[in-house]
UniProtKB/Swiss-Prot annotation:
Protein's name according to its UniProt entry: Probable Fe(2+)-trafficking protein
Transmembrane spans: none
Keywords: Iron
Subunit structure: Monomer.
Gene Ontology CC: cytosol
Family: Belongs to the Fe(2+)-trafficking protein family.
Record-linked InterPro entries: Fe_traffick_prot_YggX, Fe_traffick_prot_YggX_sf
Protein function: Could be a mediator in iron transactions between iron acquisition and iron-requiring processes, such as synthesis and/or repair of Fe-S clusters in biosynthetic enzymes.
Organism: Edwardsiella ictaluri (strain 93-146)
An example Gene Ontology molecular-function term: iron ion binding
Keyword Iron: yes
GO biological process, one term: cellular response to oxidative stress
Length: 90
């Protein structure tokens, strides 16, 4: 049986993550308060960020940038801005 969380990103009850997929306190916070659906949306944005900004996950500065963007996206309601990208609906 899947677990349910109140997703702070979607602002409603939704299916929770199966396991803590990010380390540390931030990972615990994500596991407790972010749904699978919201995490999937972040994963898509993360992929775009890594590709468009040519981030190197071996570089601590790039990992820090990604962690900051993730926290802003999931918990503060900020969308990820990728220069030159126009969503398909617009």
């Amino acid at each position: 049986m899947s677990r349910t969380v109140f997703c702070t990103f979607l602002n409603r009850e939704a299916e929770g993550l199966d396991f803590q997929s990010y380390p540390g306190d931030l990972g615990k916070r994500i596991y407790d308060h972010i749904s699978k659906e919201a995490w999937g949306q972040w994963m898509a944005k993360q992929t775009m960020l890594i590709n468009e900004k040519k981030l190197n996950m071996m570089n601590p500065d790039d990992r820090s940038l990604l962690a900051r963007e993730m926290e802003k996206f999931l918990f503060e309601g900020h969308d990820v801005h990728i220069e030159g990208y126009t969503p398909p609906n617009q």
